[in-house]
Swiss-Prot record:
Inhibited by the conotoxin GVIIJ. It comes from Rattus norvegicus. Residues 1135-1145 have a biased composition (Acidic residues). I repeats lie at residues 112-410. The lineage of its organism: Eukaryota, Metazoa, Chordata, Craniata, Vertebrata. This is Sodium channel protein type 9 subunit alpha. The sequence contains 4 internal repeats, each with 5 hydrophobic segments (S1, S2, S3, S5, S6) and one positively charged segment (S4). Segments S4 are probably the voltage-sensors and are characterized by a series of positively charged amino acids at every third position. Residues 347-363, 915-927, 1393-1403, 1685-1697 dip into the membrane without crossing it.
Length: 1984
């Protein structure tokens, strides 16, 4: 790492001409160097700029203060990277770094010219940016004016002037564009430049449409981003996530195009079908009207309109489409609905319709229109689009954004780690300089009794030399003295807040002299280690605390924010507000005194007992007097007054931990044992002191920087805010304290809060006077109680302490507001103040962890979302202004197009507020309706562009970022372990006390009764036993002095707590004594059992809790195995578990009754070995065998399905179909008997015990009971009784029995049941959250939604005619068609308020509610148009908090819960390292494949040629291109095209048909009968046949079937095959892969959803079949038949249009409905609904389907997406294995799975990378040591395995995986078993080499013999002879050398042998033999 220059003021050097000359010299030296070693340069990476010294960042703290003369002056660059670049830096007062280019600006201003220097000074001054900021904001305000007055023109010029001035200054200071750091090199400056250029252009050049150009001024608002520092990063993140979205976008557009094509083919022109009047005037015919009608207006009078609708009623020609009323016929005429914008007539409109479907905006309307015009069967199209398009693609976008966010987070964490290391090195260097001095000084201070004053003097003398200090030491000294004199007496007051405070006053200014030697070093170390540990728990990595930290450790600002945001919501002293940021950002990370710091103390690691002498903490105090410990935690005292050793857990995982420890040891040895004389020598001591004071002052500096407030504040606080006047007062205070702090008081207050909330919730609209008075008195009482609580707490704790606790501040605010409200209660318009009382509800969070967590998550997200919200606000603002500037005028001018009365509609863009509302509505996902209006008044293109931009930028990206943040705050570990506080547990203590009291009473009673019966008390032993754990208090009480405990009231609480939890605690904490002390805050030990799933401590999690979780797991296992009693289609558990789960004797039933029963009633016990008992036992065994038989189960499943199916027939037409009715009645009886029989059989077989301990059996039991009761009632003739009727509807639950029978569904249900607790929790929290809005709504709108309407057309009377209720009643008496009516969904009471809020939150039916609210005037007054316009704000706030946050919380909770469940079930991934995962996944893929037999090449030459052509990749791609072209021609088609176009398209179509037929024929010729072995080929064949038939019989087919062209669209799916060939399409492949992976899970969820829909459809049919047809219920969409109910329910699954279906059901009495109406053909009377049933029905369905099932869908997709992305980044993917087998097929045409050794080299060279081994590859292949079977053949698996290993590298897990894989493969291909390997490639090579060596040796031997025997004449001949073999050998040796011997060796030695151990030797041996052979060979050569 390039070290930074030595920190401190010396590092600042003025930038002078010499500096410039030096830089130039360096540059020339560099260039000279570069010429010398050009080659080297490529290899090495150059230095990188330091990220802490980037322009725009704060100067790192380590540099200290800037010397006064150097502020705003050019200085030499501090970053070594720029040493040879022409740059200099300037620092402003705020220590921000500005970097400039040192070349002359604009070629004339050098860095030393006065003009440039002045420009630089202006530019870096903070006021300059403030001025620009203010200008921008003022400018924004002016832009929002819709009709600006004349004088604003001049203001405009001023703005332009200021912006020009700003740019001029920047250009003068920086230069224009040549070189780094000049004006145009910063992209943000481009924005300024463009804005200014446009300003001048529009002013001086006449460009026609000025308003469009003027909208460019809006971009000025974007400048805020460049001025505010945090925003740039967020925008960066946004841009990143948009980049990541590119793949999803491509996929989305592709899918939408395909769907749009299908829509175009199916529904072209259908939406023009309208109901046309039959009776025409004499001379009129249909044709004549069509031809003569010039405009839509003329046709209108002939069409049929439903009341209140703009468009004519649609109809269709098929039987299941919408029919026309009497007197009308269905005709295709006029334009499409919604101004003609909703249609499938051309590809573009179809695409828009599908985009709308995907975003689910008002899609129910499109759905209803299409089904009405085309027929109900087309529901299938919508199901596919909604599930694939909408759910899948939209959630993929979410997944991608979340991952981008997560990656960014990871990157930040990495960067932080890096910083930490650099920082460590830097500090080490500082330490070395100051270490000895420090040690000596500290020792001197401790061991001598020199007067304070001398020390002070010394430190003063040294402060001049201090490099870092800049504050006067005198100030500090004086303050220190004063502080010391003020040591207060009444400190140690038991309360833990007092404990933390006690350290504050005295040691605030204690110098580091008071720290022990080690203590002093520790301040340093603490600084390093604390940031690493999460402030809330030890859980997770070292850096978990920095999870959200964005900035570096060095920078002063910013870091604190992140830490603060992660801490406890309520007790966070370092709140996120105010200017304390710079204080909190310092290098110290404060220890939070009021939090459980699990991470500081343990007894695991000990360090020598060196501690601050006085045992006080070094601490700093902020404005509220909050103490932040700077040094370690408080010293712990032993009873004898000694100090306990302080212990630090170094739970470090990074590399610095080791060094820290060594340093600590080294330092201790050197510094602690100082020589005596050194201490006694005053001179030495003085020197030590002066050097040490340097550091001292640094520490002081830090503390000052961390102080929130000026010193006088502390003096004031200690004088006035701590009340210790007289001893009596103190006694009184203690008494009050004892009372107020008692848990029972807390319980009482909590009960009061709940009651108060109830009282507030009881307000409703028509209230009696008495009720009002009761509520008023109640309010007074509660206000009194809370005020009293506050006063008493103030007395008990002193204001100083009282306001340290977040909750207390909160309480005091609410009490104050309540009191103010009491006095202002009668003032008109202040009733809103009452809603402040509602905040009391939040006090519940104190004792309700989930609510607390929710608030924390919202707090956290708001912290992190602060910047994001700003960006969102800027985006909304920009678009609102753009809309207003572009379309405002058009709305005014063309308003008659969209409104008959020519008044502006509610949604328009004529002024800023309304424009803002439209943009906000688009962000909520409702864009299509306002867009139609916009397109109608302002033209299509501009509106489409603007709306799409808002939609994509705003809705998709920002809202998803919102979600990503929510999810990340969920997954961050510190929230899963809910932070328990002392207060939070007070309730539990109280409850425990009550329980104990009850138990005690029970016990005494029992003993008393037993005594009175004079029996020996049985229970005494038990009680002793249970009381026992409480005697082990040592477990729970960590080291605190007994003295302290007796003082501490909290201890008393502990006692209660501990004994209260008794045995449960005992279980979980029995063997954790060692950890006990650091689970909790050292000064307070509260033990709360932690659930194994959510424990804070990983250490505990691993071993201690394993026993616990095991028991959980086995329970789970038991449950699972027991589910077979009610279903034998059961999941076999993996491996060993299966054996465990089976009963001892599989075919014998268990005992009938539980042991308890048998003990009570001995008669239950039967002897089964003889007599009746034996017969009974035989019967039971027989029953058991029957029930356990698989056929029995299948039969029952069939019966369940049949009986459920039977329910679907009972619709309103059943009365007309008599035979079906009779059949159903009999069937019903039969089913009931069968199910009763099944139940009895199971009772006999399993016994009651087993049957009734199984939840699924209970379900069966209850459902059978219902059938039984209805059966009995029917036979007795009571079938028409009300209760019996409602019981009959419960039969709808029958399908639930299918749940336990289908594995897939059961898995989903189990997962859901697991999630229910957390879902309920979140639901409750949401209800509390919404309660506040609901009560507020009741206060604002109760009784104000009434209006006086004209019942004939439903219009409202204007206020001029009817002003209030009494006038309306007067009118009613005059005419019959007037009515004073209320909105059905209103805020008249809290319950209805909830319903209204649900409609607002799901954005369905919210418009009516909002309009009523905005128009409301007063109770009993007629509403007035937009009278209370700003009531919109109430809804906006609710949507943000109530809808976005809480509904997204559901997603968060479900996903989080699934992950936790996965952990509990022990998903393999949790226990695998990254390496193992890689191998595991590769194996998973390998095992599933096997070589296939390729289609053999035909022998015929001609066929062979065609075969080669057809199997070529190019052929495939060509066909693909043709398919795409065919699609394009299909896109060109449109409704009503010319005949010529028809003709052209017809011939193009013919060409395509001929081409595809040609392809088909070619393939048939070459592939022969093998053609039909491939699925796609069959599909193509069918399409071709249909197309040919279709050419001749087009009319007929289209009339009766779907048009055959549709099948061609499906062929697009073939694109999936081509994606494999395109390397760039990896991202899209990943997405599709994720979809494939999710399909099984999604299918299960779909099944479950279908089941839910089925049950609800049956319920709906029996309850709402006869309701009045209005709003959403009409002739097609209703609950009359099963099909119609399903159509309605599918629509509500996405929560679309449920308000319309609910509205008619809310009609409960005339005049809304007619209770006496007769329905012909049925006995039912009336068409009124049942409001309560209706509301329950729809709300429960929405919660189940919309919130739960749909969110499970999301969870699955997110999960699989992350898995798929992981897989795509792995070195070997599925495709590589596919490729391997494709190549294999060529080498092994008969699919023998073996290949000859001789072919291996070619095979390896034929593969694609990464498996490819290019030639020459012989040696590498030999070294792989592959097993061979007879005939020198090698198995494909062995080859693949070896190649895989080569790619992945060696891993220890290989062997086990290998065997797993083989097992898998064997089961897939039994053929392999017969071949046992005989040898291996390596062994074969060794044998060959050995053979040659033996041969050679033998030859030599023969040769020698020869030489001896024969005379020298023959020697030449012999030589020539001998050369032959030698030549061969040398050739082989050469080969060996050329192919890099190292490589061979490495592979040989690193690759482990395969699993055929019998054949091969172990590695080591093999390697050695290799070596010896080589040596032999070399010896041979040398011999020769």
């Amino acid at each position: 790492m390039a070290m930074l220059p030595p920190p401190g003021p010396q590092s600042f050097v003025h930038f002078t001409k010499q500096s410039l000359a030096l830089i130039e010299q360096r540059i020339s030296e560099e260039k000279a160097k570069e010429h010398k070693d050009e080659k080297k340069d490529d290899e090495e990476e150059g230095p990188k700029p330091s990220s802490d010294l980037e322009a725009g960042k704060q100067l790192p703290f380590i540099y200290g203060d800037i010397p006064p003369g150097m502020v705003s002056e050019p200085l030499e660059d501090l970053d070594p990277y720029y040493a040879d670049k022409k740059t200099f830096i300037v620092l402003n007062k705020g220590k921000a770094i500005f970097r400039f280019n040192a070349t002359p600006a604009l070629y004339m201003l050098s860095p030393f010219s006065p003009l440039r220097r002045i420009s630089i000074k202006i530019l870096v001054h903070s006021l300059f940016s403030m001025l620009i900021m203010c200008t921008i904001l003022t400018n924004c305000i002016f832009m929002t004016l819709s009709n600006p007055p004349e004088w604003t023109k001049n203001v405009e010029y001023t703005f332009t002037g200021i912006y020009t001035f700003e740019s001029l200054i920047k250009i003068l200071a920086r230069g224009f564009c040549v070189g780094e750091f000049t004006f145009l090199r910063d992209p943000w400056n481009w924005l300024d430049f463009v804005v200014i250029v446009f300003a001048y252009l529009t002013e001086f050049v006449n460009l026609g449409n000025v308003s469009a150009l003027r909208t460019f001024r809006v971009l000025r608002a974007l400048k805020t981003i460049s001025v505010i520092p945090g925003l740039k990063t967020i925008v960066g993140a946004l841009i990143q996530s948009v980049k990541k979205l590119s793949d999803v976008m491509i996929l989305t557009v592709f899918c939408l195009s395909v769907f749009a094509l299908i829509g175009l083919q199916l529904f072209m022109g259908n939406l023009k079908h309208k109901c046309f009047r039959k009776e025409l005037e004499e001379n009129e015919t249909l044709e004549s009207i069509m031809n003569t009608a010039e405009s839509e207006e003329e046709l209108k009078k002939y069409f049929y309109y439903l009341e209140g609708s703009k468009d004519a009623l649609l109809c269709g020609f098929s039987t299941d489409s919408g029919q026309c009323p009497e007197g009308y016929i269905c005709v295709k005429a006029g334009r499409n609905p919604d101004y003609g914008y909703t249609s499938f007539d051309t590809f573009s409109w179809a695409f828009l319709a599908l985009f709308r479907l995907m975003t689910q905006d008002y899609w129910e309307n499109l759905y209803q229109q299409t089904l009405r015009a085309a027929g109900k069967t087309y529901m299938i199209f919508f199901v596919v689009v909604i599930f694939l398009g909408s759910f899948y693609l939209i959630n993929l976008i979410l997944a991608v954004v979340a991952m981008a966010y997560e990656e960014q987070n990871q990157a930040n964490i990495e960067e932080a780690k890096q910083k930490e290391l650099e920082f460590q090195q830097m500090l080490d260097r500082l330490k070395k300089e100051q270490e000895e001095a420090e040690a000596i000084a500290a020792a001197a201070a401790e061991f001598t009794s020199i007067g304070r004053s001398r020390i002070m003097g010394l430190s003063e003398s040294s402060s001049e030399t201090s490099r870092l200090s800049s504050k006067s030491a005198k100030e500090r000294r004086n303050r220190r003295k004063k502080k010391k004199q003020k040591m207060s007496s009444g400190e140690e007051k038991g309360d833990d807040e007092k404990l933390s405070k006690s350290g504050s006053e005295e040691s605030i200014r204690k110098k580091s002299f008071h720290l022990g030697v080690e203590g002093h070093h520790r301040t340093r170390e603490k600084r390093l280690s604390t940031p690493n540990q999460s402030p809330l728990s030890i859980r997770g990595s070292l850096f978990s605390a920095r999870r959200s930290s964005r900035t570096s450790l060095f920078s002063f600002k910013g870091r604190g924010r992140d830490l603060g945001s992660e801490t406890e919501f309520a007790d966070d002293e370092h709140s996120i507000f105010g200017d304390n940021e710079s204080r909190r950002g310092s290098l110290f990370v404060p220890h939070r005194p009021r939090e459980r710091r699990s991470s500081n103390i343990s007894q695991a690691s000990r360090s020598p007992p060196v501690l601050p002498v006085n045992g006080k903490m070094h601490s700093a105090v902020d404005c509220n007097g909050v103490v932040s410990l700077v040094d370690g935690p408080s010293a712990l005292m032993l009873p004898n007054g000694q100090l306990l050793p302080e212990v630090i857990i170094d739970k470090a995982t990074s590399d610095d931990s080791g060094t820290t420890n060594q340093m600590r040891k080294k330092r201790l040895s050197s510094s602690y044992f100082l020589s005596e004389d050194m201490l006694n020598d005053p001179h030495l001591r003085q020197r030590a002191m002066s050097r040490a004071s340097i550091l001292t002052n640094t520490v002081e500096e830090l503390e000052e920087s961390r102080q929130k407030c000026p010193p006088w504040w502390y003096r004031f606080a200690h004088t006035f805010l701590i009340w210790n006047c007289s001893p009596y007062w103190i006694k009184f205070k203690k008494l009050i304290y004892f009372i107020v702090m008692d848990p029972f008081v807390d319980l009482a207050i909590t009960i009061c809060i709940v009651l108060n909330t109830l009282f507030m919730a009881m307000e409703h609209h028509p209230m009696t006077e008495e009720f009002k008075n009761v509520l008023a008195v109640g309010n007074l009482i509660f206000t009194g109680i809370f005020a009293a609580e506050m006063v008493l707490k103030l007395i008990a704790m002193d204001p100083y302490e009282y306001f340290q606790v977040g909750w207390n501040i909160f309480d005091s605010l609410i009490v104050t507001l309540s009191l103010i409200e009491l006095f202002l209660a009668d003032v008109e318009g202040l009733s809103v103040l009452r809603s402040f009382r509602l905040l009391r509800v939040f006090k519940l969070a104190k004792s309700w962890p989930t609510l607390n967590m929710l608030i924390k998550i919202i707090g956290n997200s708001v912290g992190a979302l602060g910047n994001l919200t700003l960006v969102l606000a800027i985006i909304v603002f920009i678009f609102a202004v753009v809309g207003m500037q572009l379309f405002g005028k058009s709305y005014k001018e063309c308003v008659c197009k969209i409104n008959v009365d020519c008044k502006l509609p509610r949604w328009h863009m004529n002024d800023f507020f309304h424009s803002f509302l439209i943009v906000f509505r688009v962000l909520c996902g409702e864009w299509i309706e306002t867009m139609w209006d916009c397109m109608e008044v302002a033209g299509q293109t501009m509106c489409l562009i603007v709306y799409m931009m808002v939609m994509v930028i705003g809705n998709l990206v920002v809202l998803n970022l919102f979600l990503a943040l929510l999810l990340s705050s969920f997954s961050s570990d510190n929230l899963t372990a809910i932070e328990e506080d002392t207060d939070a547990n007070n309730l539990q203590i109280a409850v425990a006390r009550i329980k104990r009291g009850i138990n005690y009473v029970k016990q005494t009673l029992r003993e008393f009764i037993l005594k009175s019966f004079s029996k020996k008390p049985k229970g005494s032993k038990d009680t002793k036993r249970t009381a026992d754990p409480n005697n082990k208090k040592e477990n729970y009480i960590s080291n605190r002095t007994l003295a302290e405990m007796s003082k501490d009231h909290n201890f008393l609480k502990e006692k209660d707590r501990i004994s209260g939890y008794g045995s449960s605690l005992d279980k979980s904490f029995m063997d954790e004594n060692d950890y006990q002390s650091f689970i909790h805050n050292p000064s307070l030990t509260v033990t709360v059992p932690i659930a194994p799933g959510e424990s804070d401590l990983e250490i505990m999690n691993t071993e201690e809790l394993s026993s616990d979780s095991d028991s959980d797991y086995s329970k789970e296992k038991r449950n699972r195995s027991s589910s077979s009693e009610c279903s034998t289609v059961d999941n076999p558990l993996p491996g060993e578990e299966e054996a465990e789960a089976e009963p001892v004797n599989a075919d014998e039933p268990e005992a009938c009754f539980t042991d308890g029963c048998v003990r009570r009633f001995p008669c239950c016990q039967v002897n089964v070995d003889s007599g009746k008992g034996k017969v009974w036992w035989t019967i039971r065994k027989t029953c058991y065998r029957i029930v356990e038989h698989s056929w029995f189960e299948s039969f029952i499943v069939l019966m369940i399905l049949l009986s459920s199916g039977a329910l679907a027939f009972e619709d309103i037409y059943i009365e007309k179909k008599k035979t079906i009715k009779i059949i159903l009645e009999y069937a019903d009886k039969i089913f009931t008997y069968i199910f009763i029989l099944e139940m009895l059989l199971k009772w006999v077989a399993y016994g009651y015990k087993t049957y009734f301990t199984n939840a699924w059996c209970w379900l069966d039991f209850l459902i059978v009971d219902v059938s039984l009761v209805t059966l009995v009632a029917n036979t007795l003739g009571y079938s028409d009784l009300g209760p019996i009727k409602s019981l009959r509807t419960l039969r709808a639950l029958r399908p639930l029995r299918a749940l336990s029978r289908f594995e897939g569904m059961r898995v989903v249900v189990n997962a859901l049941i697991g999630a229910i607790p957390s879902i309920m929790n979140v639901l409750l929290v949401c209800l509390i959250f919404w309660l506040i809005f609901s009560i507020m709504g009741v206060n604002l709108f109760a009784g104000k939604f009434y209006e006086c309407v004209n019942t004939t057309d439903g219009s409202r009377f204007p206020t001029s005619q009817v002003a209030n209720r009494s006038e309306c009643f007067a009118l009613m008496n005059v005419s019959g068609n007037v009515r004073w009516k209320n909105l059905k969904v209103n805020f008249d009471n809290v319950g209805l308020g909830y319903l209204s809020l649900l409609q607002v939150a799901t954005f369905k039916g919210w418009m009516d509610i909002m309009y009523a609210a905005v128009d409301s005037v007063n109770v009993n007054e007629q509403p007035k148009y937009e009278y209370s316009l700003y009531m919109y704000i109430y809804f906006v706030i609710f949507i943000i908090f109530g809808s976005f946050f809480t509904l997204n919380l559901f997603i968060g909770v479900i996903i989080d819960n699934f992950n936790q469940q996965k952990k509990k079930l022990g998903g393999q991934d949790i226990f695998m390292t990254e390496e193992q995962k890689k191998y595991y996944n590769a194996m998973k893929k390998l095992g599933s494949k096997k070589p296939q037999k390729p289609i053999p090449r035909p022998g015929n030459k001609f066929q062979g040629c065609i075969f080669d052509l057809v199997t070529n990749q190019a052929f495939d791609i060509t066909i693909m291109v043709l398919i795409c072209l065919n699609m394009v021609t299909m896109m060109v088609e449109k409704e009503g095209q010319t005949e010529y176009m028809d003709y052209v398209l017809h011939w193009i179509n013919m060409v395509f048909i001929i081409l595809f037929t040609g392809e088909c024929v070619l393939k048939l010729i070459s592939l022969r009968h093998y053609y039909f072995t491939v699925g796609w080929n069959i599909f193509d064949f069918v399409v071709v046949i249909l197309s040919i038939v279709g050419m001749f019989l087009a009319e007929m087919i289209e009339k009766y079937f779907v048009s055959p062209t549709l099948f061609r669209v499906i062929r697009l799916a073939r694109i999936g095959r081509i994606l494999r060939l395109i390397k760039g399409a990896k991202g899209i492949r990943t997405l599709l892969f994720a979809l494939m992976m999710s399909l099984p899970a999604l299918f299960n969820i779909g099944l479950l959803l279908f089941l839910v829909m089925f049950i609800y459809a049956i319920f709906g049919m029996s309850n709402f079949a006869y309701v009045k047809k209005e709003a959403g219920i009409n002739d097609m969409f209703n609950f009359e038949t099963f099909g119609n109910s399903m159509i309605c329910l599918f629509q509500i699954t996405t929560s679309a249009g449920w308000d319309g279906l609910l509205a008619p059901i809310l009609n409960s009495a005339p005049p809304d409905c007619d209770p006496k109406k007769v329905h012909p053909g049925s006995s039912v009377e009336g068409d009124c609904g049942n409001p309560s049933v209706g509301i329950f029905y729809f709300v429960s369905y929405i919660i189940i389907s919309f919130l739960v099932v749909v969110n499970m869908y999301i969870a699955v997709i997110l999960e699989n997406f992350s898995v798929a992305t992981e897989e795509s980044t792995e070195p070997l993917s599925e495709d590589d294995f596919e490729m391997f087998y494709e190549v294999w097929e060529k080498f092994d045409p008969d699919a023998t799975q073996f290949i000859e050794f001789c072919k291996l080299s070619d095979f390896a060279a034929a593969l694609d990378p990464p498996l490819l081994i290019a030639k020459p590859n012989k040696v590498q292949l030999i070294a792989m040591d592959l097993p061979m079977v007879s005939g020198d053949r090698i198995h494909c698996l062995d080859i693949l395995f070896a190649f895989t290993k080569r790619v992945l590298g060696e891993g220890g897990e290989m062997d086990s995986l290998r065997s797993q894989m083989e097992e898998r493969f064997m089961s897939a291909n039994p053929s392999k078993v017969s071949y046992e390997p005989i040898t291996t490639t390596l062994k074969r090579k060794q044998e060959e080499v050995s053979a040659t060596i033996i041969q050679r040796a033998y030859r030599r031997y023969r040769l020698r013999q020869h030489v001896k025997n024969i005379s020298s004449i023959y020697i030449k001949d012999g030589d020539r002879d001998d050369d032959l073999p030698n030549k061969e050998d040398t050739v082989f040796d050469n080969v060996n050398e050329n192919s890099s011997p190292e490589k061979t060796d490495v592979t040989a030695s690193t690759i482990s042998p395969p699993s055929y151990d019998s054949v091969t030797k172990p590695d080591q041996e093999k390697y050695e033999t290799d070596k010896t052979e080589k040596e032999d060979k070399e010896k041979d050569e040398s011999r020769k």
